[in-house]
Amino acid sequence: MKNNTPHAPLILASASPRRLDLLARIGIIPTHTLPADIDESETPKELPRDVALRLAQEKAQKIYENNKDKNAFILAADTVVACGRRTLPKGETQEDACYCLKLISGRSHRIYGGLCIITPNGTVIKKCIETRVKFKHLSKQEIDQYVASGEWKGKAGAYGIQGRAEAFVKSIHGSHSNIVGLSLYDTMNILNGLDFFKPV
């Protein structure tokens, strides 16, 4: 059986251990991880899906412009969690976590995964992947226990589906890995279309 190996280096424009782990599942080990220092503020009336796509592209573009390895592909992603048209914050404080969990308790919400890949010749490919998630109704005790766990820290929407919060999920429509931080299906499809892999 033939394996696929990347024919060119790939720079992940992120320091996220979750995205590194996801890429490793499909046999991709980035040659470098370079978090992009960009302004992640929303613009007025910007829709959540547009935020995810814009931030992913800005991250990729920032690394591409400063990258000295002209044979490298750049991959960037951004995750935005939204309930209705309301964008949920990343979990920075316990107040953030309580706010998010109370808002999505018993409700459906959407995860928008912005994905941007820039090829060595500067071609930009971008896509926004949407996953719908429905949580069960959360009791005060469940919210308090989850907040005390600290799992929500730094995560979009203040929860991580790969941890204790998976027990809150009634249903998922779409890519599970998109919720974690990167749609593997879409990433692989785009890279295959760019001849990123070659058989060995």
Where are these regions (language model features)?
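Residue-level signal for inorganic ion chemistry
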Residues: 23, 56, 78, 97, ...
